[in-house]
Amino acid sequence: MAGNTIGQLFRVTTFGESHGIALGCIVDGVPPNLELSEKDIQPDLDRRKPGTSRYTTPRREDDEVQILSGVFEGKTTGTSIGMIIKNGDQRSQDYGDIKDRFRPGHADFTYQQKYGIRDYRGGGRSSARETAMRVAAGAIAKKYLREHFGIEVRGFLSQIGNIKIAPQKVGQIDWEKVNSNPFFCPDESAVEKFDELIRELKKEGDSIGAKLTVIAENVPVGLGEPVFDRLDADLAHALMGINAVKGVEIGDGFAVVKQRGSEHRDEMTPNGFESNHAGGILGGISSGQPIIATIALKPTSSITIPGRSINLNGKPVEVVTKGRHDPCVGIRAVPIAEAMVAIVLLDHLLRFKAQCK
């Protein structure tokens, strides 16, 4: 399995499975002399970790990160940073029924077909639990971006099912409000509707999809390497690598289909851009405007409603998911998406500095 690393100069490699001993990652390319400790990383992990509200999986994990290397006397040394998070609240017995059968909508079938073996406990490597280490690595990237470039990477939940939040204007989003509710939502009226919907889904044993938006502010002009390493291409690659993500939009995204050129083009004046339909990226290079990325996440297939599938022998079976799962995976995906955007931005910033300045 060779797809465990992302980035060129700022490189993140993750390892571990959902019900293994621990999760871990190696982060290469962190510049030296960045003040860093577990306290800088833990807040983002706490935003992602399970069991923090009635809207997410009841699985409880402390998700306490431990830095193993690359930090000396409170500062990064420029060498590889190793981190681990130990798993604690596994209930592997919940997955005995799917040892020889495939859960519909999951990676069980494709992993088995590709490798001829799979860790069926909680999905193994394909579980979203792996993303905890992406969040840990992303927290380092976010800290460096903020302290050295003034770049802020923040996200919010913009839709669950058919419920959409009120339109948000960059620069006017109340980020304290976003972080004060379990849905990471800036619209109080939508929070109440989200609450009602999730309660209903939990009673039904079903799940729902979601959409979330990440905004990176104060990004300088010039990030991105045309033609194959365009900034928007790398952002899409990173965000599509998140479990359950089925679509990525930059700026207006798919809405551009209905726009005319006279509407979509971001006209310029001596005072700057008049609009930001492009989402802060032109020709694959950052324009200096806020970068806006939106992702769509599918409803999880881990539901208690029986579903048809097959077993290892290709025979028809019925599958009822046991274990503990999120009714909407989009809720805990906000810090994950932030992390992936931050990782890509820091990688491109280091590449830009190496080539252009």
From Swiss-Prot:
One of the GO biological process terms: chorismate biosynthetic process
CDD domains to which the protein is assigned, alphabetical: Chorismate_synthase (cd07304)
Gene name in the database record: aroC
Taxonomic superkingdom: Bacteria
Protein name: Chorismate synthase
UniProt cross-references to HAMAP family, sorted A to Z: Chorismate_synth (MF_00300)
Subunit organization: Homotetramer.
Pathway membership: Metabolic intermediate biosynthesis; chorismate biosynthesis; chorismate from D-erythrose 4-phosphate and phosphoenolpyruvate: step 7/7
Enzyme class: lyase
Record keyword Amino-acid biosynthesis present: yes
Region annotation Disordered: where it falls in the sequence: 38-60
Cofactors, names only: FMNH2
Gene Ontology CC terms: cytosol
Reactions listed under catalytic activity: 5-O-(1-carboxyvinyl)-3-phosphoshikimate = chorismate + phosphate
Biased composition (Basic and acidic residues): 38-49
Keyword terms of this UniProt record: Amino-acid biosynthesis, Aromatic amino acid biosynthesis, FAD, Flavoprotein, FMN, Lyase, NADP
Molecular function as annotated in GO: chorismate synthase activity; FMN binding
Family recorded in the similarity comment: Belongs to the chorismate synthase family.
Cofactor notes: Reduced FMN (FMNH(2)).
UniProt cross-references to Gene3D superfamilies, sorted A to Z: Chorismate synthase AroC
Binding positions for FMN per the UniProt entry: 125-127, 243-244, 283, 298-302, 324
InterPro entries: Chorismate_synth (IPR000453), Chorismate_synth_AroC_sf (IPR035904), Chorismate_synthase_CS (IPR020541)
This enzyme's EC code(s): 4.2.3.5
Function: This reaction introduces a second double bond into the aromatic ring system.
Binding site residues for NADP(+): 48, 54
